[in-house]
Amino acid sequence: MNTTYSFQIYKSASLLPVEWNLLAADNIFLTREYLEVLENSSPVNMTCHFIGIFEEEKLIGIVLTQFLFAEKLESFGERDKCLKTSVRNFALKNFASHVLFIGNNMLTGQNAFVFDKNIKQSKAIKTLHKAINQLKKDLKESGKKVHITSIKDFTAKEIEPLQAEFKNNYTFSTQPNMIFEIPKNWETEQDYIDALSKKYRDQYKRARKKSDGILKQKMFLDDIKKYEDVIYDLYFHVAKNAPFNTFFLARNHFSFFKEIMGENFLLYGYFLDEKLIGFNTLIKNGDVMDTYFLGYDESVQREKMLYLNMLYDMIAYSIKKGFREIVFARTALEIKSSVGAKPVKMYGLITHSNALINHNISRFFNYLEPKTEWQERNPFK
């Protein structure tokens, strides 16, 4: 029997079908609760929509989209000031300021959609294509024409069925996703230290010695609210000094996240002389630990090797709690590699509404996405 697939676009997590979370069981980043966090504490230049795909009356697919309007952004990243950066920022403002992401631009990995395992995937993807076109039409009618549509992030195998449907899209690959696989026989941080080669064990010891005097503290909701402004300033310092940025978080993002997600969201503060000088965040996603945003005082970070110590702390916690892997995501590839994370190449699809630009999308894309040169390390024996 040839049943028809349909779709429904939702503007609020409160309107999602009651059975939504059944499909999101294996990915916290598609649950109603997380989508509520996104909706209520998203970056100032981001609007989220959620798509349900149905077979007759049954929900068989769930999708997250994010619409970014970059003209509200003060900076695309302040670290690199040169002619190419100026050209890139001009191109962004004029030809790429309205971007529709199918997926989550705040995370790395396949957090775009989930389909029921018993349905015909190609048919669901075709319905997704129709839903995207409808959403673009709706946005245009509200005065927000989409310049770029991007479907992200997928492994080489995951992207194949999408390439078959979205034939006019350009397949791109940006920075890899840095993944730390935790061997099953590791139970403590010492197991990790013992596996390091002498050079990297010395690096570990040096970093830990440098962190003398720093107190690490798990922060609860009241603590996060108390230090909200300091936390945000530490985050913002790191974010605005990144070479490229398409959004900045809302000031209440971390407290709202903690309020809704509870123990699935962890925020650790780093104190020196009773002053908060850094923080990092972790999200429990089944047996996978996702690292999230962090921030630090630059003057202390260099002297105390704070960032490296945060990475070691994340590894130690994840081993102790029995997680299978840690998603260290993009950026700072070399230092993440030096603690044992391995690069996994990720792909996405992109198309531009302007036919001329779309014809030259590969060259245009290189302007928008700065290439990162880095050297992979292997810290293990």
Where do the protein language model's features map onto the residues?
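Active-site/acyl-donor-binding loops of N-acyltransferases
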Residues: 2-4, 67-68, 110, 154-155, ...
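Short C-terminal domain-edge/linker segments immediately following a structured domain
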Residues: 38-41, 82-84, 92-98, 180-184, ...
